[in-house]
Every structure is written in structure tokens, then in C-alpha cells.
Curated annotation (Swiss-Prot):
Main location: cytoplasm
Pfam families documented for this protein: NA37
HAMAP family noted in UniProt: NdpA
Name of this protein: Nucleoid-associated protein YejK
Keyword Cytoplasm listed: yes
UniProt KW keywords: Cytoplasm
Amino acid sequence: MSLDINQIALHQLIKRDEQNLELVLRDSLLEPTTTVVEMVAELHRVYSAKNKAYGLFSEESELAQALRLQRQGEEDFLAFSRAATGRLRDELAKYPFADGGIVLFCHYRYLAVEYLLVTVLNNLSSMRVNENLDINPTHYLDINHADIVARIDLTEWETNPQSTRYLTFLKGRVGRKVADFFMDFLGASEGLNAKAQNRGLLQAVDDFTAEAQLDKAERQNVRQQVYSYCNEQLQAGEEIELESLSKELSGVSEVSFSEFTAEKGYELEESFPADRSTLRQLTKYAGSGGGLTINFDAMLLGERIFWDPATDTLTIKGTPPNLRDQLQRRTSGGK
């Protein structure tokens, strides 16, 4: 992995009681040892693989102002990180769910792009087996489950300040409040809505195939083409390029897909991040609620699965063997 660490700082927040978060600040930067580089590379890999929200700094953002001064050489990276950790502590203290953790600031370069990664990591206890096959206690940073993470694309921020996607963050698994306090700390608001862009793409694809008067099989083939392209981009960590997708769909209609979306006013960006859960709807129908979970391939609708919108009834012809076996055993009184 072509990742180079410029500067990295580590601090700690310790929750002493319900009211107080103690600040423990390092007096020096971390040395970019092999172990440190491997840790940052793992953070980069894990973060890049997750669905993210996009944002931009507000004009009043204290973090953005401090970062700008640091980038201009008016403040060193350690002082910047120490002051920012203090602001983070102040924001966290407003929320009853606030816990401590290891606060990490890392300025690094990956594939000619400069980033600032900010995260709060849990330092967890575990066990390890040593060379004598004895079991000893150990601690580790829970990188795989980190949900308080933000990354600023410094290259994008400085070369294209009008961008709505230079800042990315995770919304967190424990609810909206995690995103709220972190956005307050960053002094940021949501920017590009990747889910909305992906939903708009799906609607445009359906309308495009309808206007081209394709039959059901042809429509599904187009949806599969779109899914394959988007999934490849997702796996490669690349964005969906509207013009590239349009070339994939050449021959479907006399009008190109990119021309169609522009003429119909779908307001799709020239490129935008792929959203895995939204794109899955291209090839599958899925839903759950009221104790019922249903998931099936889109091509089965109208063939083995039929929906009557008037009665909101779904009819399935031919159940999966394992489900059929369970039903037969239950209805016959078996266990």
C-alpha cells in the first residue's frame, strides 16, 4: 500500500465519572515506525471500505480555521492536535453517552492525495498466548469497529474549496447523536448526499429503459449491467462516473444515458460515490417488518412471484426446499 505518514499525534480521553472526561495529551508526535504505519494502513483500509456521509466545513468552523493555520505553517501539528482534542472533549462532555478513548490525528498521503484522519478508538482488553503457551492479558485498538471517524481530503479542500465532498465521516452505529457531536466538533454540515444520488440513478435507469420501450428481460439486463459497473467501481474504491456508465449502456437507446439524465433534469453529479445498499435494489427486492423478512431476485417478479397492489398481496409459486421442508414438518405436527 502506497501510504506515507507525514505527521501523527495520539492523545487520550479518560472517563472518570458521569460528569468528567480527563484529558491526557502527548508532548510529542508519534514516530512513524513500521507498527504505526501498519496501524494507519489498516485504519485507511477499514474506513475506505465503509459507507460514508459527505460534508463540508461551515464558515465558523474552529477546526477548519485551526487546520488552515497549521497548513500555512503558523502552528505545528502537535499543538493543533492538542487544541483540537480539547475541543472534542468539550463537545463530548455535553452528551450523557460520552465515553473516553484514544484520539488520533494523522496527516498522511495515499496515491498523491493528502488526508487528515481524525478518529476516537476504543482501547479494549483481551487475552493473548505467549511463546511459552501461557495466557496473558493484553490491550488492542478496536479499529474494525471504529464509528467515530472523519477524514478530510486536504488536496480537494485546498484546490476546490467549493466542493461538497472533501470531508467524509461515519454516522455511527449507536444513533444519530454520535454524528451530531462529531459534526459539531468538526464545525461541518452534510454535503453531497450519496444515497440520494444513487436513488436518483436507479430512477433514471428505470425511466431510461421505459422510454426505450424495452421488454422485461431487456430491462433486467440493463439493470444488471448498471449493477455490475457500479459494483466494480465500489470494489475498486472508485466513484460512479456517469459518462463511463453511459458508454456501458450504449446501444440501449438512440439517446445516450448521460444525455437522457441531463435532458430530464435528474440532477446527478458527473461522478458520485456508490452506495451498496441502494445499488442492491437493481437486482433484488428486499424488505422486512412485522416479523416478516423477504428477499428475492428482481427477475422472479412476474414469473414465480406476483404482487397485487390492490390487495397488497404477494404470491409465491415454488418455495425454497429448506423452507418447504420446515412448513411440511410444522403442518404435519413434526418437530
